[in-house]
Swiss-Prot record:
Entry keywords, A to Z: Cytoplasm, Isomerase, Porphyrin biosynthesis, Pyridoxal phosphate
The gene coding this protein: hemL
A GO cellular component entry from the record: cytoplasm
Subunit structure: Homodimer.
Organism: Shewanella loihica (strain ATCC BAA-1088 / PV-4)
EC number of the protein: 5.4.3.8
Protein name as annotated: Glutamate-1-semialdehyde 2,1-aminomutase
């Protein structure tokens, strides 16, 4: 047995399934997960000492690469002053100002400790502000594991093959309406059925938990118009896309102004973090200025704020997002070219620093039902082939891939050469 396999068996004795988040268990691809000991730049290193070119990036946060020297130093400096205070700090003020500077729709910001906490709080705020109960989400979109959101959820819940999770009362789920991502008519139908009951729409502007599905032209604009027409709030969940798709997130990339935005991942520089914010009129409805309650022991934690600020400042460098997008395009288009060369049906999507690939005859994948019909066995074969070649992809056909600024010419060339070899073996 490898060291990773030994650790996995040991972990299963004390941790449910041996992991602290289901997708890490490799259930979607089979085999044993790699236990990671360290990471640097574009590489992660497992417990057996093997290096992998990493396209998971801790599921998105590591946009500058692992163990970035400025982020590491910011954390070390912050630790000198203490780990947590449970009181306001200048760091959280600076973080809020930086977020507002980069995302104009966010006039005020509340820091929390996770993406789930951010979306849960934003929905509570939307319900309180509108005095309505129902929310509208999309099949295949994942917004964390709050009860009201695990209804036909994507990501790990999709991999488990469960449309929702046991333990969620029907009385909770009945207030969550689900529509078809990229199909505006399904949203219109729900608003016509519940014209004065829907508090908000929440969506991933680029669906990154059913692989990578960008919005089709007119979809986001149509949602904005419907929210305005029916008095609902538009919540854009940018936990994944925030500061990864562009300097101002997916909303800046596509030119859409939401009422509320949720953030996470990138704004923590690798530390646990989340945030939600939006129009001042709405944000003033949250305690202590308003009646909607929300609180958190570690909200605005100084270590997370220090790491996040260091990363956010680096992301303001001229030309950074253009370079990141070019790298992402090269990987995605390179996968497509290699698959075509060997007669393997493959469709690709990419935007900013995110990419996805689908084993299907379809030219473009735009909907949840199309994702579920892709060739899962081909994905598993490709995944393990790439893993053997030293390339670490997300261990699920329902997860997006991520590039970082640390991925250089060498890593891109080696990844595409590996893909060519794996596709060649699959074609035999």
């Amino acid at each position: 047995m490898t060291r990773s396999e030994t650790l996995f068996e040991q972990a299963k004795k004390t941790i449910p399934g041996g992991v602290n988040s289901p997708v890490r268990a490799f259930n979607g691809v089979g085999g044993s997960p790699r236990f990671i000991e360290k990471a640097d730049g574009a590489y992660i290193y497992d417990a057996d000492g093997k290096a992998y070119i990493d396209y998971v990036g801790s599921w998105g946060p590591m946009i500058l690469g692992h163990n970035h020297p400025k982020i590491r130093q910011a954390v070390l400096d912050a630790v000198e002053n203490g780990l947590s205070f449970g009181a306001p700090t200048e760091l959280e003020v600076r973080m809020a100002e930086k977020v507002i500077e980069m995302v104009p729709s966010m006039e005020q910001v509340r820091m929390v400790s996770s993406g789930t906490e951010a979306t849960m709080s934003a929905i509570r705020l939307a319900r309180g502000f509108t005095n309505r109960d129902k929310i509208l989400k999309f099949e295949g979109c994942y917004h964390g594991h709050a009860d009201c959101l695990l209804v036909k959820a994507g990501s790990g819940a999709l991999t488990l093959g469960q449309p929702s999770s046991p333990g969620i009362p029907e009385d909770f789920a009945k207030h969550t309406l689900t529509a078809v991502y990229n199909e505006l008519e399904s949203v219109k139908t729900l608003f016509e059925q519940y014209p004065e009951e829907i508090a908000c729409i929440i969506l991933e502007p680029v669906a990154g938990n059913m692989n990578c599905i960008p919005p089709i032209p007119g979809f986001l604009e149509g949602l904005r118009a419907l929210c305005d027409q029916y008095g609902a709030l538009l919540i854009i969940d940018e936990v994944m896309t925030g500061f990864r798709v562009s300097k101002s997130g997916a909303q800046g990339h596509y030119g859409i102004t939401p009422d509320l935005t949720t953030l996470g991942k990138v704004i923590g520089g690798g530390m646990p973090v989340g945030a939600f914010g939006g129009r001042k009129e709405v944000m003033q409805f949250i305690a202590p200025t308003g009646p909607v309650y929300q609180a958190g022991t570690l909200s605005g934690n100084p270590i997370a704020m220090s790491a996040g600020l260091a990363q956010m400042e680096e992301l303001c460098a001229e030309g950074l997002y253009e370079e990141l997008a070019a790298k992402t395009k090269r990987i995605a288009e390179g996968f497509k070219a290699a698959a075509n060369k060997h007669g393997i049906p493959l469709s690709i999507n990419y935007v900013g620093g995110m990419f996805g690939f689908f084993f299907t005859e379809l030219e473009q994948v735009t909907r949840f039902d199309q994702v579920t019909q892709c060739d899962a066995e081909a994905f598993r074969t490709f995944y393990h082939g790439m893993l053997d070649e030293g390339v670490y992809l997300a261990p699920s056909a329902y997860e997006a891939g991520f590039l970082s600024m640390a991925h250089g010419e060498k890593e891109l060339e080696e990844t595409l050469a590996a893909a060519d070899r794996v596709f060649a073996r699959m074609a035999k």
